[in-house]
Amino acid sequence: IHVDVMDGIFVPGRTMPFKEMRKIYKYTSKRLDVHLMVEDASKLITKYANLNAEYITIHVESENVEQNLKLIKKYAIKAGIAINPETKVKELVPYLPLVDLILVMSVEPGKGGQAFLPKTKNKIKEISKLIQEHKSNGPVMEMKR
């Protein structure tokens, strides 16, 4: 189950509070794929790790990226990193050894109903090349719109 978590600061939208998510989650045994679109992910990583997350994805544009990726790994959860449409691909390089998933945003995060941004197709090609250059077993890439 993919869960978007938005704080209204990092992105304009907000999602339900964690305590509400916890209530809903008790009705399923499915593992979560958590996408944290928040300024400070460290506050939420532990909470979602304890909610049976399989993946937790943070943004390369957020705070304390390396520290937060290591925290995700500490819980034996697959770590993902998302990149916004306007962010340069080279920003991912320092984190490639720490991630299992790269999420390419094909819209501006935090708003629904947007049209696909065609320029993100080139970003996928760039990231694929980057993975080949910097890491033998690259992370999985997915696109979100």
Which positions does each model-derived feature cover?
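N-terminal active-site wall of soluble small-molecule enzyme domains
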Residues: 2-71
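Conserved anion-binding
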Residues: 43-44, 53-140
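Glycine-rich beta-strand-to-loop/alpha-helix junction loops that act as flexible
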Residues: 142-145
